[in-house]
């Protein structure tokens, strides 16, 4: 059994590498941008080159796990629709077709941004309605996967966090931590709600579903629901950071890229199938604190 982990240098990809090592699962990892260890670079903005590179790296994968993302997220997609489509749709289609030729399973991470945020909490089969290009592209790839594969796992997730001090694309709490450590103020959207998801929970749940052959579409997020401002305050209290530096933004700026402000994903479906615990907000923050303390010893 060999897992091909695409984007193994990112937060989610690194966690897959860690857990594969712990379970003695053979894996091959690729990177898209920053160098890390012996990971091989694959250009996912060049789908033709990508397919050839994957063939050379891992000709017989058991499963392909796609953790690749672009720095800048939603804003980057709106400003760079061409590269965004290549990464989030065209490369995914190539990978799906390649997986089918190899009889390999495929794991794809999607987003709460496939919804409009008007009627939470959302179940997997609720009507979608993305408000921005990022969500549209994620949904388009979801549809292609579901129409062209049998052995797939689509995990919709959101607000993924974990300790990754070296990343050039920090998650929300890492960005908050770095900003306050520099003595700067941090503007926090109190109008933006979601499910904070510790990366370890996300990856453990995905691996468990894959191991049990529970294919399909799932919501995999933390069991808590909170706005970004209160989440930031909770983190600061635990980390001993200056809470006065957190500036509460109660209204979205007029030029913000449209997005769902009330994004609550229902996890009843996945909870019935896995033993992995999806921790709530406070438990997830305690996990993060343990990681931080371990890294600075």
Residue ranges of model-derived segments:
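NAD(P)-dependent short-chain dehydrogenase/reductase
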Residues: 143-194, 201
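NAD(P)-cofactor binding segment of oxidoreductase domains
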Residues: 76-107, 139
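NAD(P)H-binding glycine-rich loop region in Rossmannoid oxidoreductase-like domains
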Residues: 44-87
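Amphipathic terminal alpha-helices
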Residues: 281-297
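N-terminal Rossmann NAD(P)H-binding glycine-rich loop of SDR-like oxidoreductase domains
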Residues: 1-23
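Conserved Rossmann-fold NAD(P)-dependent oxidoreductase catalytic core, especially the SDR/UDP-sugar
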Residues: 93-131
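Mid/C-terminal beta-alpha module of Rossmann-like enzyme folds, strongest
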Residues: 203-205, 212-255, 261, 296-297
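Glycine-rich Rossmann NAD(P)(H)-binding loop
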Residues: 187-193, 218-226, 273
């Amino acid at each position: 059994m060999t897992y091909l982990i695409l984007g193994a240098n990112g937060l989610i990809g690194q966690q897959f590498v860690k857990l594969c090592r712990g379970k003695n699962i053979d894996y091959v990892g690729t990177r898209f941008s920053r160098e890390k260890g012996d990971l091989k670079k694959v250009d996912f903005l060049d789908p033709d080159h990508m397919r050839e590179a994957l063939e050379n790296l891992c000709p017989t994968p058991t499963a392909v796990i796609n953790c690749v993302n672009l720095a800048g997220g939603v804003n980057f997609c709106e400003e760079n629709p061409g590269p965004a489509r290549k990464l989030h749709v065209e490369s995914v289609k190539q990978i799906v077709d390649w997986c089918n030729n190899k009889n390999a399973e495929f794991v794809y991470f999607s987003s709460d941004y496939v919804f409009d945020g008007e009627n939470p909490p959302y179940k997997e089969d609720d009507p979608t309605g993305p408000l921005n290009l990022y969500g549209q592209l994620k949904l388009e790839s979801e549809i292609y996967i579901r129409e062209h594969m049998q052995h797939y796992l689509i995990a919709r997730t959101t607000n993924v966090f974990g300790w990754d001090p070296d990343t050039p694309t920090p998650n929300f709490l890492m960005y908050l931590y770095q900003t306050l450590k520099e003595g700067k103020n941090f503007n926090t959207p109190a109008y933006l709600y979601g499910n904070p998801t510790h990366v370890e929970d996300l990856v453990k749940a995905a691996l468990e579903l894959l191991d049990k052959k529970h294919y399909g579409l799932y919501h995999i997020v933390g069991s808590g629901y909170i706005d970004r401002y209160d989440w930031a305050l909770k983190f600061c209290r635990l980390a001993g950071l200056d809470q006065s530096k957190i500036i509460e933004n109660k209204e979205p700026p007029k030029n913000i890229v449209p997005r769902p402000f009330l994004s609550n994903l229902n996890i009843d479906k996945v909870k019935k199938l896995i033993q992995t615990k999806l921790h709530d907000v406070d438990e997830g923050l305690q996990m993060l604190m343990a990681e931080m303390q371990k890294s600075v010893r």
